[in-house]
Amino acid sequence: MDVHEILLVEDNPDARETLRLLLELEGHRVVPAETGESAIALALANSFTLALIDIGLPDVDGYQVARRIRSSGASMKTRLVALTGYNQPEDVRQALAAGFDAHVVKPVDPDALTRMLSDLLRE
């Protein structure tokens, strides 16, 4: 199994810790962030394979985080996954338009997340 470095952006401490543990159990290295601005700084300064980004962040929303990461050019290879409590077709369209590669609804199903990440990281 390949080890990937994953940026995890979630402002809720319990959700962040749960997702961090899940990803680490899968063998990945996880770098946590709790704000959009810190996520952008980390993404631009590092080379992550994947970033899980909560849409509802307290400072800069996840859509803006994705747009800024994508517009930098440096992180074009990073797979971006939106974490959100909304699953309407418009929510998915908005995530894709912002530059996300995938859309995951919270609360996250661990098995479904593991399968989806495996598929994304294989591409």
Positions of predicted regions on the chain:
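Conserved acidic carboxylate
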Residues: E10
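Two-component/phosphorelay signaling modules centered on CheY-like receiver
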Residues: P13-V31
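Acidic, metal-coordinating helix/loop segments flanking the phosphotransfer/catalytic sites
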Residues: P32-L50, R93
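Acidic catalytic/metal-coordinating carboxylates
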Residues: T35-S38, D61-V65
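The feature encodes the CheY-like receiver
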Residues: P58, Q88
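C-terminal output helix
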Residues: E90, V108-L117
